[in-house]
């Protein structure tokens, strides 16, 4: 494993972080037991991963991450989130209510008040059985929420940091709703986060010209998400992404472009599309840590191996630039 200082914070993290959110939720969404999820987290630690990211949903990944890491808590970093829907402590207990409330809050620009944010953070600490958080993010903030989030929630996070309950303040974007990074660009202009979480992958490289240089100039740590989640799990996913995404290629052209790209990967010894995706993001200048999310121990090992491989061959990099 390789390790990196996370921007201007004093945190030193593995270059790969295990995410507890996303579609898999450590395998809990795909049939894994609590014990299997704990074993996966501990396997990640054995592989050298020291950053573990959760979604701040009480009764879910936070509690499992806390239990799994208790024996090695002093050796790891925990990153988690507070959602900004009103009454975050309530909605975080129920996944469907969480989704509905978060979507409504995004649409209407609603933000929890300061007391609700602090209460949620305290509940998260209890769920993790921890006395501190290394990184606490304002979660999935959309442009319409940003001003209220800074007004209401940021002072709470600053007090928590001053009290030693959190070591770094972060903010994550809603990549699917804000693919051009308008919110993070504004946050970096105002220079309050220590860490940001941004979407970046082979199909949407726009952070390269906005978030990444701004973060570098400010000394802000960058965690990269969505390395494979948008159309990069399989050949069929890539065809759909090229057909339905920006540019909307005719399906036959999308299939031909995908087939040519997959042939190139094979010719250069790149074993899979997801391997290429993780490797690509890991070596993007300006991204400190990439998130991997899985419930499968074999996939975890493969993803870590991909991230720790060298940069992709130059012909493959040129082909990535030509994909979209």
Stretches with model-predicted labels:
Residues 1-88:
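N-terminal binding-site loop/beta-alpha segment at the start of enzyme catalytic domains
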Residues 3, 141-324:
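Beta/alpha (TIM)-barrel catalytic core signal, keyed to glycine-rich beta->alpha loops juxtaposed to Asp/Glu
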Residues 6, 18, 37, 52, ...:
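Conserved, mostly hydrophobic/aromatic
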Residues 8-10, 66-77, 125-131, 158-162, ...:
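Acidic (Asp/Glu)-rich catalytic clusters
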Residues 13-17, 50-51, 57, 75-79, ...:
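Structural preference for beta-strand elements that scaffold enzyme active sites
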Residues 22-35, 102-118, 141-147, 175-178:
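Active-site mouth loops of central-metabolism enzymes
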Residues 30-44, 112-127, 177-187, 277:
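Short, acidic/polar
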Residues 123-144:
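Active-site groove signature of glycoside hydrolases
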